[in-house]
């Protein structure tokens, strides 16, 4: 249900402005000795830094979880903005999925999440300013705890990404 809720929030609480939410959790530990099973993929969690807008970034996990990330997701979190010059819904439907693009200066951040507990492919069109650019999308890996990297050489702006159950993806377009 966590992924379904996450895919509903951009269309309800977050539709007209900032909201209070503390996403982007990679570990299964809430605190020392207390575990909670994360129901989404790590790429879904990474995407929430873009999909949700709260006025300032506040990630909810322990420092160890972020320090143990592979370099590309770690760099993504270092660069993701808290203030946006432009935001747009690229594709989605409440509780099903959401793909959001947000611009800070000349840099676009893309985040997409699935609210369904099944494998799927999501298709969307990039903002006009992003068409023709090459970049790497951080996607679901072999299981919910792994990332993969999808180089994109875009020509027409149409993107298709395969997702794991409760999956997601994120990317930076310069």
Report the location of each language-model feature:
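A common structural junction motif
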Residues: 128-133, 141
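Conserved, mostly hydrophobic/aromatic
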Residues: 51, 110, 166
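A glycine-rich phosphate-binding loop feature that marks nucleotide/adenosyl-phosphate handling sites
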Residues: 64-73
């Amino acid at each position: 249900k966590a992924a379904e809720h996450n895919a509903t929030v951009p269309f309800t609480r977050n539709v007209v402005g900032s909201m209070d939410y503390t996403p982007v959790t990679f570990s299964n530990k809430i605190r020392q000795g207390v575990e909670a099973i994360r129901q989404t993929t790590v790429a879904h969690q990474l995407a929430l830094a873009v999909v949700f807008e709260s006025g300032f970034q506040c990630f909810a996990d322990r420092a160890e979880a972020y320090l143990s990330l592979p370099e590309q997701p770690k760099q993504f979190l270092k660069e993701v903005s808290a203030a946006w010059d432009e935001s747009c819904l690229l594709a989605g439907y409440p509780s099903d999925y959401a793909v959001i693009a947000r611009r800070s200066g000349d840099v676009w951040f893309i985040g997409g999440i699935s609210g369904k507990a099944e494998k799927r492919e999501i298709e969307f069109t990039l903002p006009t300013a992003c068409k023709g650019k090459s970049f790497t999308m951080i996607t679901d890996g072999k299981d919910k705890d792994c990332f993969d990297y999808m180089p994109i050489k875009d020509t027409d702006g149409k993107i298709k990404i395969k997702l794991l159950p409760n999956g997601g993806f994120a990317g930076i377009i310069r």
